[in-house]
C-alpha cells in the first residue's frame, strides 16, 4: 500500500511575533492553543499563504467578519508581517519519501495600498538533518540572526550538492509542481480551480456549512465531461461549412490539377536529366579516383618489385660467389678423397706385407726354435752316443781287466769317503752347518746365482778384455751403429748413448704402437674441429640471416623464443587464414548488404522526402516514430482546440448576427412579438417614442426606464386589461405604461440622479437603482452605433473563422499526411540512413579491402617470418646439438696437442722403422761398447777384482757342486761291501755290457734321424730368412711411398673425406638450386616489372584522359549548380532516389515527361519555346532554365486570395490542403450527422450512473460521522424530472421528433433545446439562446441535483442548513462535506499524477472550542481513518492526550513582541511531553 504524504512542519520567518519558528506538524491533529491574539490565526494564515499564494483570493478575516463583503485593503496579510524579508515554508515528505520544502517569500510594499509581494519557491533534496530555519536565516552572533534574501537563499541552496532550488513566476507552475509531488489533491490549472481550492480551505478554516460550496456542489464534486458537447460542436461546424466547401472545391480543383501536372512532369523531365548528369559526373569522378588509386598502387608495386629485383640480384651474386667457392672446395675434397683412397690402398698393401712379415717372423722364430731344439737334441744324442760308446768301451775294458773293475769299486768306496769330506768342506766354506746332501742342490742354486753374477761380471770384463784384446772390430761395428742411430757421439759416451737408446727403444716402440689410436683420435678431433668450423659457419650464416649476433649459449633461449614465435606465427597464420576467410565473408556480406541497402535507399529517400515535408509543415524536428505519433496527438489536440475556437467564433458570430438581427428590428424592438402586441393594444413602443434620442442621452434614458424600456405606451391601461386575459405569446415580463404616445415624457418617475446612475422612486416603498449601461441601445443613434461595432466584430469574426477553418483543414491535411506517412513510410523512415550506411559500408569495404591487402602483405610477411623462423629453428636444430662443440674452446688446443703427440708417435714409428734393425743389432753388441780397447788397464784391474770375486763364488759353488756331484757317491755305501762280494761281479759286468751295447745302437740310430731332421730344419730356416728379407725391403718401399703421399690412412679418413665431399656436393647442389631459383625469380620479376611499367603507362594515359574529361565537365556543371542554387530549386531537382537508377532509365523517364510537357505547354508559346531549347543534350543548363520558367509561370498563376504563398510546389500543397480540408469537412459532416440522439442519451445516462455510484462510495465514509445531535451525514444525488423526461424521449421516442433533428436549419444543440422546450412548455427559457440551452443540455451535470442531508435526533434526515444546526454540528457537517470534496478530487486526479503518489490531506479548524469533546473525538477518529492531518486553533487545550499541542503566549519584552511557544505531544501512548521550545531568536541588527 502506498504511504500517504505528510506535512512535516510549518516554518514562519519574520512574521509578527515569530522571527524564526518551526512548528512540527502531527501526523493527525496539531492543536494551536492560546488566548486571543496569541498568534493562532497568524500561524494558520502563514500555512494558507504558502499553500495558495494568490493575492486575488487571500482574505484573512476574523470570524466576526463572516458576512462582510469588504475589509481592509491588505485582506489581513500585510499586518501579520514584519518589515523586511519574510518566509512561510511547508516541509513535506511525499509518498516517495522525497523531502520537499515549498514556500513563499513575502515582503511588504511601501505605500498606502498596504500591498504584499509574494514569490513562491521550492527546495528539493534537502538533507533531513537540516532544518528550514537553518537555511532561511544566518547567524550573526550567539543570539542574533539575519534573514536571508531570496537571491542569497538561492545561492546558499545551490551551493549544496544534490539540492535543487526553483523559483516560480507563475502560481500555476508552482501548483503544478506541488500537484506532481503530491502536496495538493487537485491540479489547479486556472484561477477558477484555485478559487475552488481556496474556498474549500476557507470553509475549513472558519468552519460551518459554506453556502459557496453547497450551492456549487456539482462543480466541486462532479468532473466536467466535454466529450459529447465537443462531438456535436464538430458536427455543427461541418454543417455550417458545407456549402462553402462545395463551392471552394469547384473553384480550386482546376488550378490544382494544372499546377500538379505541370510541376510533376517538369520536375520529372528536368530532375531525371539533372540526376543523370550528376550520376555520370559521380561515375567519372569514381573512375578517376579508381584509376588514381590503381596508378598509385601500381607505382608502389613497381617500387616493391624493383626493390625485390635489387635484393634478388644481390643474393644471386652472393650465391654465384658461394658456388665458386663451393666448387673449389668440392674439387679439393674430391682430390683429398682420391688421395685418401690411394693411401688406404697403400696402407692395405703395407698392412698385408706387415701381416706377411709378422707371419714370417713368427714362422722364423718357430723355425729357429725348432732348429735350436733340433741342435740341442742332436748334441744330446751325440753326447748320449758318446756316453754309450764310452760305457761300452769301459765295460769292455772292465771285463778285460776285472782287476781294474775291482779298483773301480775301491775307487767308489774312496769316492764315498771323499763325498763325506766334500760335504764337510762345503759346510765350512759356505758357512752352512745345516747343509746336507739332500738340500745341497737348493743351496747350489743360490750360490750358482752368486757365481753367475760374479761370472757375468767377470765375463763382461772378459768380454771387454776380449773385445779389447781380440774383438776390436766388434766395438767399431757397435760404435758405428750408435753413430748411425744417435749421430756423432764420443767413444766414451757410446756405451751410455747406446744404453739410453736401448732404454728408450721400448718407449719408442710404445709410441709407435700409439700411432694408430692417436691417428684415430686426431681424426675424431679433426672431424669435431671441422664440425665446429661448420657450426661456426652455420652460426655466422644464421646470425647474418637473423640480422643479430648471437652467442652459442644464447641459442637455446633463442630456439625457445623462435619456437614460441613459430607457434604464435603458426597460430597467427592459421588465425590469419580464418580472419582472411572472415574478412572475405564480411566483404561478401558487405556487398550483399550494400546491394540490399541500395535497393532500400530509394524507399528510404522517399520516406525522408515525406518526413522532411512533414517537418516543414509541422515546423518540428521529427527524430523518431514516437515524436511522429506524439505530434499526431498534438495535431489532434490542436485540431480540437482550433475547432473549439472556430466553433466559439462561429457561436460568437451567430450571437452577433442574432444581436444585429435583433437591433435591426424596426422601432428598436428586441422581440418581434412586442410590435404585434403594441398594435393589438393600440399603443406605441417606448423605444419608438425615444427613437430620436441622441447617443449622449441614450445611457440616461436606458437607466431611467430600466427593464421597462421595452415596454408599450398605451393611452388607457383599463382598456388593455381585457386583452391580458389568456395572453401567452408574449415576453416573460411585459411592461405597460399609460401615457400619450404623442406627448410622452419622463415625468411619470421620481428620479434622483447620481454619477452615471439614477435612483427611480417607483413607489413610496419601492426604489430602483440603475447604472448607466456601458453600451446603450436606447434610441436609433445608439443602435446604429452598436450595429456598426457589431458589423466590424462580425467581419473580424468571419475573417478569424475563415482562418481557423483553413487552419483546421491544414491541420487535418497535415494529420492525413502524417497518417499516410505512418502507413507508407514509418516502417523505414527512422531506420538508419541507408546512404550513410552505404557510405560507411563502402568505407568499411574499402577498409576491409585495404585490410585484406594489408593482411595479405602482413600474412606474407608473417609467412616469411614464419619460414624464416622455421628456417632459423631448423638451423638451430642443427646448431643446438653443436652448442657444446661451439663452446668447446679447447678443441683446437687438443687437436694441436694430439697432432703433436701423433707427430711424436709418427716420429717414433719412423724412428723405429728407420733404426729398429740397427737397435736390434746394437742390443747384442751393447757390451762391446762398455770397454774401449783404449781403456785396457782399467779393465784389467776391474777384471782382477771381478776374477777374485768370481773365484770365491766359484769355490763355494764348486764345493756345493762337488757335494751335489757326489750325491751319487753317497749311495756307494755298498761299494765297501763289494770289495768282499766279488763272486758274481763278472756276470753283472757282462749284463751291463750287453745293455750298454744295445743302448749305443739306439743312440746311433737316433743321432742319424736327428741329423737328417736338423738339416731339413736348417734349410727351411734359410728359406724363411730369404723371404723375410725380401718382404721387409718391399715394406720399406711402401712405407716410404705412404709417407710421400702425406695423407693419414686411418680407418675413418676415407669416411670423413667421403662425408666431406658429399656434404660439399649437397651444399653445391643446394646453392645451384637456389641460384637457378633466383635466376627464374629474377626473370619473372623482370617480366613483372615490364608488365607493371606497361600497365603504369596505360593507367597514366587513362587517368589523364578521364581527369581532363572531369575538369572539362566541371565548368558546365558549376554553371548548372549555380543556376540551381540561385533560383532555389536544388531541393526539387536533386532527388536522391533517382541516383539509384541507371542512365537508360533516367533517359526514358525524361523522354516520357518531355512528351507529356509538350502536350501541357502546347497553348503557351513562351514555355513551348523554352521547352524546345531545353531538348539540346549538350546544354543541360537549358533544362534548368525551362524549369525556372515553369516555376515563374506558375508563380504568376497563383491565386493570392486562396493560396498564401508564391511557391508553386507549396501552392500545390496548400491546394491539396484546401481540397483535403473541404473534403474532410464534408466527410466529417456526414460522420457527425450520423450521431443519434439515442447515443447521446445513453452517454449522458452512463455518465450520470457512474457519478451516482461514485457519490454513494463517498457517502460510505461519512456514515459513522456524528457531531452533537447529528448522527450521520450523506449526499443525495437525484436526476431532475424534466431532464429525465428528455433522456427518455431521446432514447425511446426520438422518431416522433425527427423534424427537429433532420432540419437543415437547426443544429443538434438547437434541436435539443427545442425538444426540451417542446417537452417543457411551462418553463420560461428567458433570453437564452437555444444553442446555449442545447450546450447546457449536453452537460450531464445540469441533469443532477445535489444536496447534503444530516440525520439529526428525532427529526431524521434533514437538509443540512446552518439555521437548523448548532454551531458545532454545522462545523462538523461542513468538515465532513469538505472531506468528501477532497476525496472526490483525489479520485478525479488519480489518473493525472504518478501511481506511486498519494497526496497529502490537511484541513483547518479555527475556534475549535465550539465543539464538544465527543465531536473533537469524532474529528480525531475521522483524521485517523482518512489519514488526514488537521490543524485546530482553540483558546484552551481541547485534547491534550492526542496529537501534538502547541501553547502560544504572546509576550512583549523591551518594546519587542514575540510569541512564546511550548509544545506537548499527546500522552495517550505514554509519550513524555516535549521540552519547552526555546525562545525566539532575536532579530539581527
Swiss-Prot record:
Any Pfam family the entry gives: SbcC_Walker_B
Record-linked NCBIfam families: PRK04863.1
Coiled-coil stretches noted in the UniProt entry, renumbered to this chain: 337-480, 509-605, 835-915, 977-1116
Similarity-based family: Belongs to the SMC family. MukB subfamily.
Organism annotation: Yersinia pseudotuberculosis serotype O:3 (strain YPIII)
Gene Ontology terms, MF aspect: ATP binding; DNA binding
Function field: Plays a central role in chromosome condensation, segregation and cell cycle progression. Functions as a homodimer, which is essential for chromosome partition. Involved in negative DNA supercoiling in vivo, and by this means organize and compact chromosomes. May achieve or facilitate chromosome segregation by condensation DNA from both sides of a centrally located replisome during cell division.
Gene3D superfamilies, per the entry: 1.10.287.1490, 1.20.58.850, 3.40.1140.10, Immunoglobulin FC, subunit C, MukB, hinge domain
Gene Ontology CC, one term: cytoplasm
Name of the featured protein: Chromosome partition protein MukB
Keywords: ATP-binding, Cell cycle, Cell division, Chromosome partition, Coiled coil, Cytoplasm, DNA condensation, DNA-binding, Nucleotide-binding
Encoding gene (name): mukB
Primary location class: cytoplasm
Start and end residues of each stretch annotated as Flexible hinge: 666-783
UniProt cross-references to InterPro entries, sorted A to Z: MukB (IPR012090), MukB/SMC (IPR050308), MukB_hinge (IPR032520), MukB_hinge_sf (IPR042501), MukB_N_dom (IPR007406), P-loop_NTPase (IPR027417)
Amino acid at each position: 500500500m502506498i504511504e500517504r504524504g505528510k506535512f512535516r512542519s510549518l516554518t514562519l520567518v519574520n512574521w509578527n511575533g515569530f522571527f524564526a519558528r518551526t512548528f512540527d506538524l502531527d501526523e493527525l491533529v496539531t492543536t494551536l492553543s492560546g488566548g486571543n491574539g496569541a498568534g493562532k490565526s497568524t500561524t494558520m494564515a502563514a500555512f494558507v499563504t504558502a499553500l495558495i499564494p494568490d493575492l486575488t483570493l487571500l482574505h484573512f478575516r476574523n470570524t466576526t467578519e463572516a458576512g462582510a463583503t469588504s475589509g481592509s485593503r491588505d485582506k489581513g496579510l500585510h499586518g501579520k508581517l514584519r518589515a523586511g524579508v519574510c518566509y512561510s515554508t511547508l516541509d513535506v515528505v511525499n509518498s516517495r519519501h522525497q523531502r520537499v520544502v515549498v514556500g513563499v517569500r513575502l515582503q511588504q510594499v511601501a505605500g498606502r495600498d498596504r500591498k504584499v509581494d509574494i514569490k513562491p519557491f521550492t527546495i528539493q533534496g534537502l538533507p533531513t538533518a537540516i532544518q528550514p530555519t537553518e537555511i532561511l536565516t544566518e547567524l550573526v552572533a550567539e543570539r542574533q540572526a539575519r534573514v536571508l534574501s531570496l537571491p542569497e537563499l538561492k545561492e546558499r541552496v545551490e551551493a549544496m550538492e544534490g539540492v535543487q532550488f526553483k523559483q516560480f513566476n507563475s502560481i500555476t507552475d508552482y501548483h503544478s509542481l506541488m500537484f506532481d509531488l503530491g502536496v495538493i489533491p487537485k491540479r489547479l490549472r486556472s484561477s477558477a480551480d484555485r478559487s475552488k481550492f481556496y474556498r474549500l480551505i476557507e470553509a475549513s478554516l472558519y468552519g460551518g456549512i459554506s453556502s459557496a460550496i453547497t450551492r456549487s456542489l456539482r462543480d466541486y464534486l462532479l468532473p466536467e465531461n466535454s466529450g459529447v458537447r465537443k462531438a456535436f460542436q464538430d458536427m455543427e461546424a461541418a454543417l455550417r461549412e458545407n456549402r462553402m466547401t462545395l463551392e471552394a472545391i469547384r473553384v480550386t480543383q482546376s488550378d490544382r490539377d494544372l499546377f500538379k501536372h505541370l510541376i510533376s512532369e517538369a520536375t520529372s523531365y528536368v530532375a531525371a536529366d539533372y540526376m543523370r548528369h550528376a550520376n555520370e559526373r559521380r561515375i567519372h569522378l569514381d573512375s578517376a579516383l579508381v584509376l588514381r588509386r590503381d596508378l598509385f598502387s601500381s607505382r608502389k608495386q613497381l617500387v616493391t618489385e624493383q626493390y625485390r629485383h635489387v635484393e634478388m640480384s644481390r643474393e644471386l651474386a652472393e650465391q654465384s660467389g658461394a658456388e665458386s667457392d663451393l666448387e673449389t672446395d668440392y674439387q679439393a675434397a674430391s682430390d683429398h678423397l682420391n688421395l685418401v683412397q690411394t693411401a688406404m690402398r697403400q696402407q692395405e698393401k703395407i698392412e698385408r706385407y706387415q701381416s706377411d712379415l709378422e707371419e714370417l717372423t713368427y714362422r722364423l722364430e718357430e723355425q729357429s726354435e725348432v732348429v735350436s731344439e733340433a741342435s740341442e737334441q742332436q748334441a744330446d744324442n751325440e753326447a748320449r752316443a758318446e756316453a754309450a760308446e764310452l760305457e761300452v768301451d769301459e765295460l769292455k775294458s772292465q771285463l778285460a781287466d776285472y782287476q781294474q773293475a775291482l779298483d773301480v769299486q775301491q775307487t767308489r768306496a774312496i769316492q764315498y769317503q771323499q763325498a763325506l769330506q766334500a760335504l764337510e768342506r762345503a759346510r765350512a766354506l759356505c758357512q752352512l752347518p745345516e747343509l746336507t746332501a739332500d738340500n745341497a742342490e737348493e743351496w747350489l742354486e743360490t750360490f750358482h746365482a752368486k757365481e753367475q753374477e760374479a761370472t757375468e761380471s767377470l765375463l763382461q770384463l772378459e768380454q771387454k778384455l776380449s773385445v779389447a784384446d781380440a774383438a776390436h772390430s766388434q766395438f767399431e761395428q757397435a760404435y758405428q751403429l750408435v753413430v748411425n742411430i744417435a749421430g756423432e757421439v764420443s767413444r766414451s759416451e757410446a756405451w751410455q748413448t747406446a744404453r739410453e737408446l736401448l732404454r728408450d727403444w721400448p718407449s719408442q716402440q710404445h709410441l709407435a704402437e700409439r700411432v694408430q689410436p692417436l691417428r684415430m683420435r686426431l681424426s675424431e678431433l679433426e672431424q669435431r674441429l671441422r664440425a665446429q668450423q661448420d657450426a661456426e659457419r652455420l652460426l655466422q650464416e644464421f646470425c647474418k640471416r637473423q640480422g643479430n649476433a648471437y652467442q652459442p649459449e644464447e641459442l637455446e633461449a633463442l630456439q625457445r623464443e623462435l619456437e614460441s614465435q613459430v607457434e604464435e606465427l603458426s597460430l597467427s597464420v592459421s588465425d590469419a587464414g580464418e580472419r582472411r576467410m572472415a574478412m572475405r565473408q564480411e566483404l561478401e556480406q558487405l556487398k550483399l548488404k550494400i546491394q540490399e541497402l541500395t535497393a532500400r535507399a530509394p524507399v528510404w529517400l522517399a520516406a525522408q522526402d515525406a518526413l522532411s515535408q512533414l517537418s516543414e509543415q509541422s515546423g518540428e524536428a521529427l527524430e523518431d516514430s514516437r515524436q511522429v505519433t506524439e505530434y499526431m496527438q498534438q495535431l489532434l489536440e490542436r485540431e480540437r482546440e482550433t475547432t473549439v475556437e472556430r466553433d466559439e467564433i462561429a457561436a460568437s458570430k451567430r450571437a452577433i448576427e442574432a444581436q444585429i438581427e435583433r437591433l435591426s428590428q424596426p422601432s428598436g424592438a428586441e422581440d418581434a412579438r412586442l410590435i404585434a402586441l403594441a398594435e393589438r393594444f393600440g399603443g406605441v413602443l417606448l423605444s419608438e417614442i425615444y427613437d430620436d434620442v441622441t447617443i449622449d442621452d441614450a445611457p440616461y434614458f436606458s437607466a431611467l426606464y430600466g427593464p421597462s424600456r421595452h415596454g408599450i405606451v398605451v393611452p388607457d391601461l383599463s382598456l388593455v386589461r381585457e386583452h391580458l386575459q389568456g395572453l401567452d405569446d408574449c415576453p416573460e415580463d411585459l411592461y405597460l405604461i399609460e401615457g400619450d404616445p404623442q406627448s410622452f415624457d419622463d415625468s411619470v418617475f421620481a428620479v434622483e440622479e447620481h454619477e452615471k446612475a439614477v435612483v427611480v422612486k417607483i413607489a413610496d416603498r419601492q426604489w430602483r437603482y440603475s447604472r448607466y449601461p456601458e453600451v446603450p441601445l436606447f434610441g436609433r443613434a445608439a443602435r446604429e452605433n452598436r450595429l456598426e461595432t457589431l458589423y466590424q466584430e462580425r467581419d473580424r469574426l468571419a475573417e478569424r473563422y475563415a482562418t481557423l477553418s483553413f487552419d483546421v483543414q491544414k491541420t487535418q491535411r497535415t494529420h492525413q499526411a502524417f497518417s499516410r506517412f505512418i502507413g507508407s513510410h514509418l516502417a523505414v523512415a527512422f531506420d538508419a540512413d541507408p546512404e550513410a550506411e552505404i557510405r560507411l559500408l563502402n568505407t568499411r569495404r574499402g577498409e576491409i579491402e585495404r585490410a585484406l591487402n594489408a593482411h595479405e602483405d602482413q600474412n606474407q610477411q608473417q609467412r616469411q617470418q614464419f619460414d624464416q623462423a622455421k628456417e632459423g629453428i631448423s638451423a638451430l636444430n642443427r646448431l643446438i646439438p653443436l652448442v657444446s662443440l661451439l663452446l668447446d674452446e679447447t678443441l683446437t688446443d687438443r687437436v694441436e696437442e694430439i697432432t703433436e703427440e701423433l707427430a711424436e708417435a709418427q716420429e717414433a714409428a719412423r724412428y723405429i722403422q728407420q733404426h729398429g734393425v740397427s737397435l736390434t743389432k746394437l742390443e747384442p753388441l751393447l757390451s762391446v761398447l762398455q770397454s774401449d780397447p783404449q781403456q785396457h788397464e782399467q779393465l784389467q784391474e776391474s777384471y782382477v777384482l771381478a776374477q777374485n770375486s768370481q773365484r770365491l763364488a766359484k769355490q763355494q759353488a764348486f764345493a756345493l757342486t762337488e757335494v751335489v756331484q757326489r750325491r751319487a757317491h753317497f749311495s756307494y755305501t755298498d761299494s765297501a761291501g763289494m770289495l768282499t762280494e766279488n763272486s758274481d761281479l763278472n756276470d753283472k759286468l757282462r749284463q751291463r755290457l750287453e745293455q750298454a751295447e744295445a743302448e749305443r745302437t739306439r743312440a746311433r740310430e737316433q743321432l742319424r734321424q736327428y741329423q737328417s731332421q736338423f738339416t731339413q730344419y736348417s734349410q727351411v730356416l734359410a728359406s724363411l730368412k730369404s723371404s723375410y728379407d725380401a718382404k721387409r725391403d718391399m715394406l720399406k718401399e711402401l712405407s716410404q711411398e705412404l709417407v710421400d703421399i702425406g695423407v693419414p690412412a686411418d680407418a675413418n679418413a676415407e669416411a670423413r673425406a667421403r662425408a666431406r665431399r658429399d656434404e660439399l656436393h649437397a651444399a653445391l647442389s643446394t646453392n645451384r638450386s637456389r641460384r637457378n631459383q633466383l635466376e627464374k625469380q629474377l626473370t619473372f620479376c623482370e617480366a613483372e616489372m615490364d608488365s607493371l611499367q606497361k600497365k603504369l603507362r596505360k593507367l597514366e594515359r587513362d587517368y589523364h584522359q578521364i581527369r581532363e574529361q572531369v575538369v572539362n565537365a566541371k565548368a558546365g556543371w558549376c554553371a548548372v549548380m549555380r543556376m540551381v542554387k540561385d533560383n532555389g530549386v536544388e531541393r526539387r531537382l536533386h532527388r536522391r532516389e533517382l541516383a539509384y537508377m541507371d542512365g537508360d532509365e533516367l533517359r526514358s523517364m525524361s523522354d516520357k515527361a518531355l512528351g507529356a510537357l509538350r502536350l501541357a505547354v502546347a497553348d503557351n508559346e513562351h514555355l513551348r519555346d523554352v521547352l524546345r531549347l531545353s531538348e539540346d543534350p549538350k546544354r543541360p543548363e537549358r533544362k534548368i532554365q525551362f524549369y525556372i520558367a515553369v516555376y515563374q509561370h506558375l508563380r504568376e498563376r497563383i491565386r493570392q486570395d486562396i493560396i498564401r504563398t508564391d511557391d508553386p510546389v507549396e501552392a500545390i500543397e496548400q491546394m491539396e490542403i484546401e481540397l483535403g480540408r473541404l473534403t474532410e469537412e464534408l466527410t466529417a459532416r456526414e460522420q457527425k450527422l450520423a450521431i443519434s440522439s439515442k447515443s447521446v442519451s445513453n452517454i449522458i445516462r452512463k455518465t450520470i450512473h457512474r457519478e451516482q455510484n461514485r457519490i454513494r462510495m463517498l457517502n460510505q465514509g461519512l456514515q459513522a460521522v456524528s457531531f452533537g445531535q447529528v448522527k450521520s451525514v450523506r449526499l443525495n444525488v437525484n436526476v431532475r424530472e424534466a431532464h429525465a423526461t428528455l433522456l427518455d424521449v431521446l432514447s425511446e421516442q426520438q422518431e416522433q421528433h425527427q423534424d427537429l433533428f433532420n432540419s437543415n436549419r437547426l443544429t443538434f444543440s438547437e434541436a435539443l433545446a427545442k425538444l426540451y422546450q417542446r417537452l417543457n412548455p411551462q418553463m420560461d427559457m428567458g433570453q437564452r439562446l437555444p444553442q446555449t440551452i442545447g450546450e447546457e443540455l449536453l452537460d450531464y451535470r445540469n441533469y443532477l441535483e445535489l444536496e447534503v442531508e444530516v440525520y439529526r435526533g428525532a427529526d431524521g434526515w434533514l437538509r443540512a442548513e446552518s439555521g437548523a444546526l448548532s454551531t458545532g454540528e454545522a462545523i462538523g457537517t461542513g468538515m465532513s462535506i469538505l472531506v468528501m470534496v477532497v476525496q472526490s478530487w483525489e479520485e478525479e486526479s488519480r489518473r493525472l499524477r504518478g501511481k506511486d503518489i498519494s497526496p497529502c490531506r490537511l484541513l483547518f479548524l479555527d475556534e475549535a472550542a465550539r465543539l464538544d469533546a465527543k465531536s473533537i473525538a469524532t474529528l480525531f477518529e475521522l483524521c485517523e481513518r482518512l489519514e488526514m492531518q488537521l490543524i485546530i486553533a482553540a483558546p484552551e487545550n481541547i485534547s491534550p492526550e492526542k496529537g501534538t499541542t502547541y501553547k502560544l503566549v504572546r509576550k512583549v519584552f523591551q518594546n519587542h513582541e514575540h510569541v512564546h511557544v511550548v509544545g506537548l505531544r499527546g500522552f495517550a501512548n505514554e509519550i513524555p511531553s516535549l521540552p519547552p521550545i526555546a525562545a525566539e531568536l532575536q532579530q539581527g541588527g
